[in-house]
Amino acid sequence: MEKFQTNCASDVLLDLAGPGGPLHVQLTRAMREAIRSGRLQAGSTLPPSRRLASELGCSRWVVTEAYAQLAAEGYVTATAGSGTRVRNVSGEATRDQPLPAAPETAAGARVLLDLAPGLPEVRAFPMRQWISAVRSAAASVASADLGYPDPAGHPYLRQVLAGYLARVRGAEADAANLVITAGATDAIGLLCRVLRMCGHSAVAVEHPGWHRLREVLTTAGLGAVPIPVDDQGLRAGLLYGHDAVRAVIVSPAHQFPAGVVMSPQRRAMLLAWARDSGGLIIEDDYDAEFRYDRRPVGVLQGAGQSSVALIGSVTKTLSPAMGVGWMVTPADVTPLVHAAIVRPSGPPVIDQLAFAAFLHSGHYDRHLRAARIRYRARRNRLVGAIAAHLPDCRITGAAAGLHMLMHLPVGADAASAARLALAAGVKVANLDVYRFTPIPHEPALVLGYGNLGDHQVEPAVARLELAIRGATSRP
């Protein structure tokens, strides 16, 4: 339908002289404004990426990244054989519009600006693509799939997911050793039951680390042995000093909450400990999909599949509400895992088949590519705002993931800063919450930026500045 083909280059070039930044970001911004203003009309077809790149004098990558970002934001829709069309966004909320008022916390403070870790940008959930995957799954489901589900998860999802983990994360993933769970926490809990069945009494964990992990261990009847984390990750050599410990839970890709990436030397040391002790490494592949300043690091499991159980989920990539997770276990551990499954705990079969379709179609890959662009830009904006408002604070752990660690100046009280920030409508996390024992002389806050709107970064940091100033005593 040639009459609907837009002369996109002339439309967007008018605005490319606006604010700077990478060219693909400028192009995305210009096209977004052209769609909002009506210069790019709903239903019009954008030119092929190769042609637009030629007209703009840029690489094709610039255009494809801009198209992917606009699709993720809901401004355009791409259909095989039909090209990329502008959607009708009149009357629709966009992701840069203010969020609805959030519910009040237990303390009565209304959270307006969410800088707490834990959530991805749920407003950017690829709803249309997910609905398409659900329809595809429902239309093709076999009668046999409507009976009692396989406790390990649907075979087709396990097959597709095994291929994805091998391709993207470098895992040695066999569908026979892959179990679908209700999330990473569910997977870890299942493995903890296996460890208890095998006579384990304690598990080594990262310190500082995810505080709910201790609850999972306690529920399974296991103790937690804290192993310190430094700027290279878990201090794996200290495991040799705990003879009773034969299992450890680690997050090498992006440790929470410190944000560090485990060094190659520590990875090798950890694998050596597993070989020497006959121990099991439980690898939580946390935040692995979001690495901004260098190439992603493959999973530890790919180098030590006989001693590593790999855990993953879509909590940070899509939404925690989906309740989809998985684990890949060593072949000799798999029968024990199956024996420990009291009842299927994974998502419903239709949801499993929908996620398989979502993976197989490439929607998941495209969603992650667009998300990485958004999160990288937001991280840079947040780091810049902190440098401008809080030059006495130091940022670490920002190379990957959706959170960073902000070390407060001498004399600051992190607990007071978090309380004052919450009273001002900004939710943050005190690092001491994730420590086994508080360390008052090393105050720090954990800042998450996954679900914070781009337009909210500056006001959030401005309010946080006042909170930290109010919580800092001067000599």
Residue ranges and their predicted role:
Residues V134, S143-S277, E289-A303, S307-A309, ...:
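Conserved core of the PLP fold type I
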Residues P117, L161, W326-V328, L353-S361:
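Helix-loop "lid/cap" segments that line or gate small-molecule binding pockets
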Residues V76, G223, L280, K427:
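Residue-level detector of anion-binding/catalytic polar loops
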Residues G118-P120, P252-F256, K316, L452:
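Short glycine-rich anion-binding loops that position phosphate/pyrophosphate groups of nucleotides
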Residues L119-R123, Q255-P257, D287-F290, V342:
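Short histidine/acidic/glycine/proline-rich micro-motifs that form metal-
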Residues G302-L336, P347-I350:
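Active-site PLP attachment segment
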Residues M1-A137, L146, L157, V337, ...:
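N-terminal basic, amphipathic alpha-helical segments
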